[in-house]
Amino acid sequence: MADPAAPAPAQAQAAAAPTPAAAPAAAAPPPAPATDSASGPSSDSGPEAGSQRLLFSHDLVSGRYRGSVHFGLVRLIHGEDSDSEGDDDGRGSSGCSEAGGAGHEEGRASPLRRGYVRVQWYPEGVKQHVKETKLKLEDRSVVPRDVVRHMRSTDSQCGTVIDVNIDCAVKLIGTNCIIYPVNSKDLQHIWPFMYGDYIAYDCWLGKVYDLKNQIILKLSNGARCSMNTEDGAKLYDVCPHVSDSGLFFDDSYGFYPGQVLIGPAKIFSSVQWLSGVKPVLSTKSKFRVVVEEVQVVELKVTWITKSFCPGGTDSVSPPPSIITQENLGRVKRLGCFDHAQRQLGERCLYVFPAKVEPAKIAWECPEKNCAQGEGSMAKKVKRLLKKQVVRIMSCTPDTQCPRDHSMEDPDKKGEARAGSEIGSASPEEQPDGSASPVEMQDEGSEELQETCEPLPPFLLKEGGDDGLHSAEQDADDEAADDTDDTSSVTSSASSTTSSQSGSGTGRKKSIPLSIKNLKRKHKRKKNKVTRDFKPGDRVAVEVVTTMTSADVMWQDGSVECNIRSNDLFPVHHLDNNEFCPGDFVVDKRVQSCPDPAVYGVVQSGDHVGRTCMVKWFKLRPSGDDVELIGEEEDVSVYDIADHPDFRFRTTDIVIRIGNTEDGALPKEDEPSVGQVARVDVSSKVEVVWADNSKTIILPQHLYNIESEIEESDYDSVEGSSSGASSDEWEDDSDSWETDNGLVDDEHPKIEELAAILPAEQPTAPEEDKGVVISEEAATAAIQGAVAMAAPVAGLMEKAGKDGPPKSFRELKEAIKILESLKNMTVEQLLTGSPTSPTVEPEKPTREKKFLDDIKKLQENLKKTLDNVAIAEEEKMEAVPDTERKEEKPEVQSPVKAEWPSETPVLCQQCGGRPGVTFTSAKGEVFSVLEFAPSNHSFKKIEFQPPEAKKFFSTVRKEMALLATSLPDGIMVKTFEDRMDLFSALIKGPTRTPYEDGLYLFDIQLPNIYPAVPPHFCYLSQCSGRLNPNLYDNGKVCVSLLGTWIGKGTERWTSKSSLLQVLISIQGLILVNEPYYNEAGFDSDRGLQEGYENSRCYNEMALIRVVQSMTQLVRRPPEVFEQEIRQHFSVGGWRLVNRIESWLETHAMQERAQVMPNGALKDSSSLEPMAAAELSDSGREEPEDVGMAPGEASQGSDSEGGAQGPASASRDHTEQTETAPDASAPPSVRPKRRRKSYRSFLPEKSGYPDIGFPLFPLSKGFIKSIRGVLTQFRAALLEAGMPESTEDK
């Protein structure tokens, strides 16, 4: 989809992030504005400037948009999942369409190209694809708990952000008054609660999924009333802002104190009058009102869990899901880290402190109507902050600020320009930059004279002889005609803490201006502007720029404070073996004591050496304290693991589950829900409770409910979870769900789907788009439709050569849409939210309506499938009967019955007699055994094919293919008594970390095979994963198996075969750099960070491979026992010797570095091998990162991989496309990928080419690998496999 269309160029507005002040008394000097070509990265961006990213999500950047400098937020970077962004991609650097209104996107999505980022420009919210080097980083967004590294340091260790300090430049909404600097801790949320907030209600933790709001309004006659936000939305803002119509603006929270609204009297017919004289509600009158306060009157909450509550009730029943206004006082919001979340475009409340000297105000002309052009604000703000500012004047509490101030001061350096010709010029006529800034300095307080009723302090006033008097005479029924510029600004910026009316007339409106008022504006055009205020006043502001500094605790235990965030870069893909000080760990070494009361606390870490200093603690029997065991120990990171229960990170939400510290008696009102503030190396956790009190508490007394929070976000609490069949396959790291390449549009998908279905299909009316529905129910319904429609994929492929008929094209589009809907969350699918345990009476009705619509969709699609299958049957080529029968619901339930009598005959027809072994052309074997082993993963699953003869016909073809086409390194066995079961053994490819290893799989063919893919189970032999796609719970992630949705030939169809899956596992999973198989990690290929992570992953993989092979030697599975022994009698010792040779090579290189004379000799002796490898593996060519993760993982350095012609051709295409960048200067080549990982090795390092990144070996790896090699040797000797002389 194209970028949202933007307003006219004159409307563009942005703000720069000021840098630290150069002089104490002056405003912070801003960074230099970008030039016409936009500034690229500075030359000092680090030693590896060309091998690390320039920008990350949420970065504040500046660049040229529509001819002027704008500021914006990076919303998406290449290789990042676009879940939250949908597919509203822009059009690259060419810009966006000029047509349409701001914030509306159009066109079709385009992929985010390498080297580009998606930027959302402020204030309109237009999204655009821009080249990274055309943007200037103004402020990097980091929050507590982020893992970061130094941008300008050779030190590669990472650290954890423990606190941030954000200085903001804020603009008073409705004006162009800029206040800087304002610390983010001094900004408050406008609304006390918002959607998605986590709250504590007595002992319960919940999440707000809906809320009911109201606004308190004050009329000019002093009357006050309360109005719900639905009616309030019918009023319009007298002082609108450009961002009100852009994507930075949230309609749900569009009201703020001090806002001036106007609307017809009929809207006030249903309000509740609180005080004052109720005005006459004339049909022709219009009321002008000031928002005095915004209130939440009702919360709807999904309850997550209950905490330890000694003084409370023992009931486990959650409170009512609806919290009414009288109980809101018992609700406490978890928001101790709100100050770290401020970003561009956010609206907040600012309370002026008692000491205001540090704050600076720069004021330019009042902001024009959002329909008028403003020019670019970025340069103006920079210039104002750099040159001169308006000095703040502090009024004493009893000093009243008059409404009229017309005194001229000849010493002022400029004129207050009150927006010439507001409302008279069209956007096209308004020139860019017409709203020039005011550069003036207030010389001090002046003798002021009250002319009328005083208004609240902190006013932006303009002189005028008649304007303010006319404001006094403003009646409600005349509000639409009064456009006094001054009083509008006064109202919008007035303090809600004052008891004054705050009413006034409009500075700018979307209604026509009278000639009288237009003349009045021109008359006051040159009047001076001042602003007075008093401490404690609250004003609504909008963040226009930020400057962030962070405190970081590094892995070595040191703490560095006030680091400019631009000098850091976030680490998104963190190795599981990276530990930080304060992490709780357990010992994985076999000789360690498995006492559950013993745990370790990381004191410091050596990132390069891959070791940690750990203190071991043991919980005392009393349970109220711990004792230190032994001395601090230097441990390899591969020998420890995260504690299964004690996982605490800053900002985690926790509940108290145990007694208080030191045996103190629990208080009845003791807080029990809070957030982690700090994890201490002393084995305790500091918690900020919901009442803002702090406690340092033992981890045994806390429970981290982050996992429950994630489940509550995705699962409905009304029904059961997604079912055992789903749960048993899901773990805490579902990284296998890689980018599927499908377009996941949001609401347009529903409309598109409705359009392609037959006319009789009922569709939900437009007003039902906001239905609230549990995601589980919606997902179950959609998955049902997809599961029912999926088998037709193979049917469609059998269409004639002339192309599929229209009915098939429509059906294919419907299936595609359903698949994309299946992968979307409910929040993406609908403008709603998860339901609570108890909902309002009308909610189940709307949910039922949605489910009924989905059910009708399923039924209609099923009818379409049936009709198409019948109508096109004669046009198809031998469509298998099983594909036409698979839609019958009764075939899904297994029925226990005897195997048909023709089974042995079928076995004989395919040569499947028990004990018969077939040797393929490449020397591998396929054999049929008599009985399936009892420990086969799928043996206990009852199976009865609906059409036995047809099913066995398919099996016969599979067996024939396996018997003749198995490649090197794959063995398969099936069983006479269960021909739906298979067992497979795959040898690890050479020049990969998996070489000389054996990897076993159990397989079952479903009853409707081949309409659906086979079931695979990996037989893991170690704790943890040795490959991103092979889980220790048995899950195998390959696109052909449907565990993630691939593209084209990567998807399973009725023509796919078991052999294809086995080859995919061998060639696309067991690769030389498995790290890049992780979802989204392939975008790191060619970056320094990616290389380091890949090397460390290979270290971990090698350790787990040796551990797995040790288990296989000691307890070989029955099916392949003979093959395993035969393999390891030779391959086992080959594996041992190869790793030992790597250890010796590393030791030699270490000695060579210590002795310079020897270094030259050692390096020169080994360098020719490295040079030869480099010439063989490719010439430092750009690499295609657009391939599927599995395909891209098999680099050119691997000889045993399965990088086919298709991959090679794509590589060649990518090289051609990126060739023009070769002549560009280094600063514009930050994302250039290199084919060979060896390019990251130190020059003339002399390390041999082993096919995958491993050198230099870390100290932790050497410690761990020696330990597991010792165990492997012992296992080989115990199994009667002594090392031969040839092996040595």
From Swiss-Prot:
Coiled-coil portions: 809-879
Catalytic activity: S-ubiquitinyl-[E1 ubiquitin-activating enzyme]-L-cysteine + [acceptor protein]-L-lysine = [E1 ubiquitin-activating enzyme]-L-cysteine + N(6)-monoubiquitinyl-[acceptor protein]-L-lysine
Modes of activity regulation: Inhibited by inorganic arsenite such as phenylarsenoxides.
Sites of Phosphoserine modification: 45, 82, 84, 394, 436, 510, 833, 836, 893
Cytoplasm found in the keyword field: yes
Positions with biased composition (Acidic residues): 440-450, 473-485, 727-737
Keyword rRNA-binding set for record: no
InterPro entries for this protein: UBQ-conjugat_E2_core, UBQ-conjugating_enzyme/RWD
Assigned EC number: 2.3.2.24
Known role: E2/E3 hybrid ubiquitin-protein ligase that displays both E2 and E3 ligase activities and mediates monoubiquitination of target proteins. Negatively regulates TRAF6-mediated NF-kappa-B activation independently of its E2 activity. Acts as a positive regulator of BMP7 signaling by mediating monoubiquitination of SMAD6, thereby regulating adipogenesis. Mediates monoubiquitination at different sites of the nuclear localization signal (NLS) of BAP1, leading to cytoplasmic retention of BAP1.
Chain residue ranges for the region called Disordered: 1-51, 80-109, 396-529, 711-743, 872-899, 1158-1247
Organism whose genome encodes this protein: Mus musculus (Mouse)
Gene it is expressed from: Ube2o
Name of this protein: (E3-independent) E2 ubiquitin-conjugating enzyme UBE2O
Biased segments, Basic and acidic residues type: 401-418, 462-472, 872-890
PANTHER family xref list: (E3-INDEPENDENT) E2 UBIQUITIN-CONJUGATING ENZYME (PTHR46116:SF15)
